[in-house]
Amino acid sequence: MRVGLVSPYSFDVPGGVQFHIRDLAEHLIGLGHQAAVLAPADEGTPLPHYVHSAGRAVPIRYNGSVARLNFGPLVANRVSRWIADGDFDLLHIHEPVTPSVGLLALWASTQPVVATFHTSNLRSRAMQAAYPLLRPSLEKISGRIAVSEDARRTVTTHLGGDAVVIPNGVDTGFFARATAKGEWQGTPERPTVGFLGRIDERRKGLPVLADAMRSVLREIPGARLLVVGPGSAPAAQARLPEDVAAATELLGPLSDDDKAAFLASVDVYVAPHTGGESFGIVLVEAMAAGAPVLASDLPAFVRVLDGGGAGATFSTEHPDDLAEQLVAILRDGTRRAELSARGRRRATTFDWEVVGAEILAVYETVLDARAPREMPARRRENR
């Protein structure tokens, strides 16, 4: 099967959608299919051989974050040429209503289209306003996937119709095999608390965690906060309370191998996000690596954590509740071991062996619905 995967977001900056598309492409290639990815990317950005650049992206505020998107006539020509040259059996477009490469690919598509919706935003005025203009294009989508119930509700609320829920996939074996590093491991007197996310994006929750750490340090003076992610380290350091700054190490972005080792090392991984999350791929990565997880009680996070059975939760944007639970977990080695074990088991349900099979089932359903009347004979024979 020849599959064209389309990312709306730039591969210059790491993100959950980009990781999902990259890993899906590699999973499909590993199964013997031919997969190619089209995504925005600056010139000179190192890209896997199967990723093709649609040109430089522009940062735009979107869903409480800054997304790097790509749009315009020149990009539209590149998209059309990539689709024609790829001779794909099927296009799998991610976030097809975002004004970027995905929407352009939807307009240019002539083959069957599967779309994955990642965004969770039930009050999107932009989506409501754009729906009448997008409706003819949306009718070209033969199969809809939402990465969570929250994303599915966003689709049904603003775009009509429905979508099958298939979560983001994670190579859980990669994280499970990670070896802890001594410099990131804690001791009873100096436990380590891990944060992973863009440090200058408020919805990732670092300010909430920093406030909570003030109380944590009063109870456990030797506690260390290890922060991983892109953003201005000097600016982030300056925003931290003085006592918290002294206990914080800003590690910057890490390679995939080091990220897995980081998650395998910390005593507790904290996800203090404040909103705008439809899934929570980093929670799955942390669980797969064996980190006990403490996350804000966003609906998407609670579902990933199996209703709280695979990780602990605290009241979103409540640093006092976060501090109380974090201190309790850091002081209880038995509970940490239980959270780690339950998290590892839960993470396996998001492995690519499971998720990939569900996505392929959607592909087959869409292609079978088009054959034999609309699919060229060569493609039916080679599938």
Name every feature range the model reports, one short phrase each:
Residues 41, 150, 169:
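Carbohydrate-associated surface elements
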Residues 42, 196, 222-237:
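Glycosyltransferase donor-sugar binding loop
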Residues 153, 170-186, 238:
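Acidic anion/phosphate-binding donor-loop and adjacent secondary structure
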Residues 185-204, 210-214, 226:
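Conserved donor-binding/catalytic core segment of Leloir-type glycosyltransferases
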Residues 236-261:
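Nucleotide-activated donor-binding/catalytic signature segment of Leloir-type glycosyltransferases, i.e.
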Residues 268, 292-295:
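Short hydrophobic beta-strand element within catalytic cores of glycosyltransferases
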Residues 307, 311-320, 328-334:
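Conserved acidic donor-binding segment of nucleotide-sugar-dependent glycosyltransferases
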Residues 321, 335-349, 358-361:
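A short, well-ordered alpha-helix in the C-terminal region of glycosyltransferases
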